[in-house]
Amino acid sequence: MKILILGDIMGSSGRNAINKKLPDIIKKFKIDFVIVNGENASDDGRGITKAIAEEFFQTGIDVITSGNHIWDKDETTSYIDSEKRLLRPANLVAGSPGRGHEIYFTKDKKYKIGVINLMGNIFMRKTEDVFQEAKKISKKIILKKNVDFLVVDFHGEITSEKMAA
């Protein structure tokens, strides 16, 4: 099983690189599942649009994670509820649109992959305690019980918080 995880796809240059190179990388290295952080993928580097997300999915990306810039484009608020492959941080305040974790199948349906998107609390607005949220989710998505693989994307601003996660 090969999972490719790519960090912040930045603006049009990042998207162009993904569109140009990713299909060949998937084929050459026999990648089974692709996760990218796409919260900075718009032309101005802040947020993501429905069109960009759809373009990513067509390129071979299976899941898009995010962070504090997820709401920088207004259209994301309505789109994220209907698109399970676009995640927002799970520890955003209760009632936030979308979802912060999900279980996915590989394209061949051979494996189940749990993906959890979390965001640090330092210098971030409108977040719940990241560690408490991680504990709650860990009771729902259990490695080797209901998923074969588990990936956690932690988006944070300071090193000490990332190290603690």
Regions found by a protein language model. Give the residues of each.
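Acidic, metal/ion-coordinating pockets
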Residues: 1-165
